[in-house]
Each structure stands twice: as structure tokens, then as C-alpha cells.
């Protein structure tokens, strides 16, 4: 068993990274930054300027904003100024009302909001908000983490300044993880210390079940659950249940439903993907509560571990990371050993590496379905002691080095892809 001080560090890490969120976390983080700047200003802004990194722009362009029936940044910014409370963190817009949305539309129509690309920055997650009213100016900056404020100022008075060249590398207190340590923590930690992970099941399963009753996004989850043609082709089984629950929760979230989900590493979709395949497999196969708790812990902590070297935002679709976690959790529930769990990870990396992120949007449900179906395939292969070998592609004999290969491709190798994707998104013709 891992020593208690290190266990406490890892538990604190999970509690930082697995948190509730309403709506896509990129526009919500922008709304949070607006809320902080507005609170600092102390009055309703007359003008709001947003300067954002390319990845924030990409992830906020086509996604629904909770409770508004609208997509994109302008309404998120307007509501952040009108009703946002920074203390709510990633639930900053939970007090939104129809009246607030109507007022937000007026603010947008008044041309009070401007949005631009922040040039000459290294951070992939960067949000700078400048609010002005009655000659006063308030500035708030979030960088590197969706709730990580690094600068707050009112006029010439600096209230917070963590702007340094190592802003994104200030995680010295984070525990050093590898896959073996992740596995040991998940499988040996006293149960009462990690029971809190069950909250991921409660929130994310509720989101899926709410989605089944509504009409959200492309309705992939609902169709997979109830379509006769789907049942004739795929049947009704644990595999199709995993696909329908995971995609349904994503359908609702990307469409802007006012439904909280438990996120992972700043992403609600990653939280959904790390949770629901594991929950559905456990329930369909009558696994014990302890087995579910340990499998969910393994899934979420694996995703956190991979994101440590990948970064918050990248050109790589986050479902690759989160589905790798759920594949580990499913393999564990199947009775897999640590070796078989490493096989599942290797199989995932061999399959899904390179799937691009082209922003948060309703069609993310399709990518999540691809990710979790691959998670199931990888677990099945692993249980048969089948693993992609190190003579194939980017796979290394050492699973942690394979993970580094994945994250190097996502964080370094796909930078030009990221730029091209954003260029296409900002210049394409839309209906």
C-alpha cells in the first residue's frame, strides 16, 4: 500500500481535477474570468474585451451555453458579467435565468463585447478579460488551468500577480505518478478514503438519463438506446449500453443543457468518458460497490496521469485520454491483472492516437462513442493477453514510455495541426 502522506497527496490531486461543471469548460472558464473582472470592477461593465488563446477560441466556437439556447462566447461573456459568481468556479452560470439571457442579448447587441486572439503567448489555455465602466478598468487573467487566476487588477492596483515564465509549471506539489502507482493507489487505498469518487457516477449517470428524456444535440445516445434499427444491428447489451449512456451525457452537455457533470482535468466530456463506461459495465455485471469505487478511481487517476504530460488543451481529442482510463477500469472489473491493464493502455494508444480536437460541439458525442468502443475492444483483447507489440508504430515495451509517446505527439507533434484546424474553423462557410 502507498504510504499515507503520498495517498493524501493523490487524493488532493483527484479532488482538484475531478470537479462539477455546468457547460463546456472553455466558454465557462471565460465566463468565470469575466465574473472575476466584473466583481473586481464593482459595477456592471460598459465594455468587455476578451483576449484568448487559440485553443480556447477553438473549443468555444460551436458549443451550447447552458440555459441560453445559444452557442459561442458572446453570451457566455455577457452572462459572466451579469449573473456570474466567481465563487461558483466551473458552475459560474448556474444562477442564469431567462431574464438574464434576454439582458445578455441586449449587451451583445450593444456591441459592448469584443473578442480577439491573444498573440505571442505559449500557454494553450489563456483567458484575459478587461472590463471598463465609468473610467475604471479591471483585468483578470486565467492561464494553464480552467480556474487558475494568475492576475487580477483594478486600475493601477495589482491584487494578484502570479505571472512568471513558469506559470504553467508550478505543479511541484503534484505527486509523481506512473501507471503502476496509479494502479496500486486505486486497488489498495482504504475504501473510505476514495469513496467520494462515487459522486462521478451520481452526476454523470443523471446527465445521461436526463438526456434520454430530452432532445439534445444529435441525439446519438437516445438513438442508440431506443432505435429499432440499432437494436437489430448491435443488439441490446453492455456494449450498446456503454455507448448510449456515454454519448447521451455528451449530447446534453454539448447542446448547453443546464445539467452538471463531474469533469476530469478541466473537461466535462473527459469526466463523462472516464465514468460512464465503468459504471455501466459494473452495473450490468453486478459488481460490488468496492469494485466500482476502485475501477472509477483507476479510470479517473489514469486520465489525470496522462493529462499531466499532455497538458490541459491540445490538438489531441481528450476522449483518447479519458477512454484509456475507462479501458483500465473495465479491464479491472473483468478481473484483469496489472499486466492486463497495461495491455489495455497499449492497445488504446496504438488505436486512437492522432484523433484531432476540432473544438467542443455536439458532434463530440460521436468521438466519445469511438473512444469508449475502443476502450471495450482494448479491454477484451487485454483479457485474452493480446497486446500491440513494441515493433508496431509508437508502442514501447514500457507502458509509461508509450504514454509519453502519445502525449509528445499531442503536445508537440500536432501543434501545426492545431493551427490549421483553427484556421479552417474560422474561415469556413456556415449555413
UniProtKB/Swiss-Prot annotation:
Signal peptide: none annotated. It comes from the Bacteria. Transmembrane segments: none annotated. This is UPF0597 protein BVU_2091. GO terms for molecular function: L-cysteine desulfhydrase activity. GO terms for biological process: L-cysteine catabolic process to pyruvate. Belongs to the UPF0597 family. Coiled coil: none annotated.
Amino acid at each position: 500500500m502507498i504510504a499515507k502522506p503520498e495517498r493524501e497527496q493523490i487524493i488532493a490531486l483527484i479532488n482538484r481535477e475531478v470537479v462539477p461543471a455546468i457547460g463546456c469548460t472553455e466558454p465557462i472558464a471565460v465566463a468565470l474570468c469575466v465574473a472575476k473582472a466584473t466583481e473586481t470592477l464593482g459595477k456592471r461593465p460598459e465594455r468587455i474585451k476578451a483576449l484568448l488563446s487559440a485553443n480556447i477560441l477553438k473549443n468555444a466556437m460551436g458549443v451550447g451555453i447552458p440555459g441560453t439556447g445559444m452557442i459561442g462566447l458572446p453570451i457566455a461573456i455577457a452572462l459572466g458579467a451579469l449573473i456570474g459568481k466567481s465563487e461558483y468556479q466551473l458552475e459560474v452560470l448556474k444562477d442564469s435565468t431567462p431574464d438574464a439571457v434576454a439582458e445578455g442579448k441586449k449587451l451583445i447587441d450593444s456591441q459592448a463585447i469584443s473578442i480577439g486572439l491573444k498573440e505571442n503567448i505559449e500557454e494553450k489555455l489563456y483567458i484575459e478579460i478587461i472590463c471598463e465602466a465609468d473610467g475604471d478598468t479591471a483585468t483578470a487573467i486565467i492561464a494553464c488551468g480552467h480556474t487558475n487566476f494568475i492576475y487580477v487588477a483594478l486600475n493601477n492596483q495589482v491584487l494578484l500577480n502570479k505571472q512568471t515564465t513558469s506559470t504553467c509549471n508550478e505543479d511541484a506539489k503534484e505527486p509523481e505518478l506512473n501507471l503502476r502507482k496509479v494502479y496500486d493507489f486505486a486497488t489498495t487505498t482504504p475504501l473510505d478514503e476514495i469513496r467520494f469518487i462515487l459522486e462521478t457516477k451520481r452526476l454523470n449517470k443523471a446527465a445521461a438519463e436526463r438526456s434520454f428524456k430530452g432532445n439534445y444535440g444529435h441525439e446519438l445516445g437516445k438513438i442508440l438506446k431506443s432505435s429499432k434499427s440499432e437494436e437489430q444491428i448491435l443488439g441490446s447489451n453492455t456494449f450498446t449500453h456503454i455507448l448510449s449512456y456515454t454519448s447521451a451525457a455528451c449530447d446534453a452537455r454539448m447542446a448547453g443543457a443546464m445539467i452538471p457533470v463531474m469533469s476530469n482535468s478541466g473537461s466535462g466530456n473527459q469526466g463523462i468518458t472516464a465514468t460512464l463506461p465503468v459504471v455501466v459495465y459494473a452495473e450490468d455485471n453486478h459488481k460490488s460497490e468496492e469494485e466500482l469505487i476502485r475501477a472509477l478511481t483507476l479510470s479517473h487517476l489514469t486520465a489525470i496521469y496522462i493529462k499531466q504530460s499532455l497538458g490541459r488543451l491540445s490538438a489531441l481529442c481528450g476522449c483518447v485520454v479519458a477512454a484509456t482510463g475507462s479501458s483500465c477500469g473495465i479491464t479491472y472489473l473483468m478481473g484483469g491483472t496489472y499486466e492486463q491493464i497495461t495491455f489495455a493502455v497499449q492497445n488504446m494508444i496504438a488505436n486512437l492516437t492522432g484523433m484531432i480536437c476540432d473544438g467542443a460541439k455536439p458532434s463530440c458525442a460521436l468521438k466519445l462513442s469511438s473512444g469508449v468502443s475502443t476502450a471495450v475492444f482494448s479491454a477484451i483483447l487485454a483479457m485474452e493477453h493480446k497486446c500491440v507489440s513494441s515493433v508496431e508504430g509508437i508502442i514501447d515495451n514500457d507502458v509509461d514510455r508509450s504514454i509519453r509517446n502519445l502525449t509528445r505527439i499531442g503536445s508537440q507533434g500536432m501543434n501545426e495541426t492545431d493551427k490549421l484546424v483553427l484556421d479552417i474553423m474560422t474561415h469556413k462557410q456556415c449555413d
